[in-house]
Amino acid sequence: MGAIHEETANRSPIPDGHQGAGDRAADHRHSARRAGRWPAPGGVCHFAGADQGGGVAGGQSRMGSSRGTAPRGLRASDGGTAGASSVHRQEVGSRRQEETGTQVMKTLVTAIQKGGQGKTFATCHLAFDFLERGLRVAVIDLDTQGNASFTLSAYQSGYLASQLFTGDTDDLRYWFGKREGESLALIAADANLANLDKMELSQAAAALRASVAALGEFFDVCLIDTAPSLGVAMTAAVLTADYMLSPIEMEAYSLQGMKKMVAVISNLRKQNPKLRFLGMVPNKVDARKPRHVNNLATLQQAYPQLILPFSIGARDSIAEALGEQMPVWKIKKTAARKATQEVRALADYVFTKMEIAQ
């Protein structure tokens, strides 16, 4: 079977050689194929420093951005991360683009070995936000629960996730070549994903890499949502991705899941050296609960270089938005405003770290 042996993964140390977050500017070159398709952003503005102690990033959110148009600018974080210990140093999302003269599609996977952490929330909201920036976005749902497929059902491409592992890349190119005008395309989860654990990991990873490479001819960004188990699908996705993001709740079981995931990342980066871990996103944080505050402090102490400099609060408006198949900034309630600021801050952070050209 293709899954990584958990005991072996957990013995792997985190690699040294941290590169400071945000120390490289994005490369805003266009390829000839993509030039002129979308308007470039009008400028760059900054959002205020974030509260590392479980609070919310400050600054104004982009309320009212219209779908399908690039906003006037994007906000780049002015905050750094705390110094990393020698044990837990990890390069955090600071990757120089290849000097090829073209802008290649960037691929991000959301993954953690624990369910209910917010992977689907992050995937869907990044997709909605990137769409508003004028990017062409492909979303791959590799979780048989299909929650991302539900929220993004209005953007069905008709191509199924299992076909990325079993189909022909020429067929994939033909399929999306006919639908090239679509700016957001969902590659939905299907029942056949359950059969992937019967595949050899090397075969599954090679097939997914080839399919994602073919998707790169039609999209600027590919976002992959994964199941919480370290099976063939998640492992193949991590071996394919350029970047990885791990939402995490502030509960004891979640912290255990993150410890496993950090070890797995170290192991898989040996096979996928281009992978950059953007960090852990503290999610569903309730500052009124002492255990959440204490667990966040524990995470920050254990992995100071890997915790994002802001958190997402425990807000019902986010769950409501996912159920209503829309981003939280479309929820017309006062309670959704704070959630909007937090989610926009996350999207800005990820966008900047992925060095996506517009």
From Swiss-Prot:
Keyword Methyltransferase: yes or no? Answer: no
What Pfam family is a match, any one? AAA_31
What biological-process GO terms show up in the record? DNA replication
Could you list this entry's UniProt keywords, alphabetically sorted. Answer: DNA replication, Plasmid
Q: Where is this region: Disordered?
A: 1-101
Gene3D superfamilies, per the entry:
P-loop containing nucleotide triphosphate hydrolases
What does the sequence similarity comment in the record state about its family? Belongs to the ParA family.
Protein's name in the database: Protein IncC
Recorded source organism is: Escherichia coli
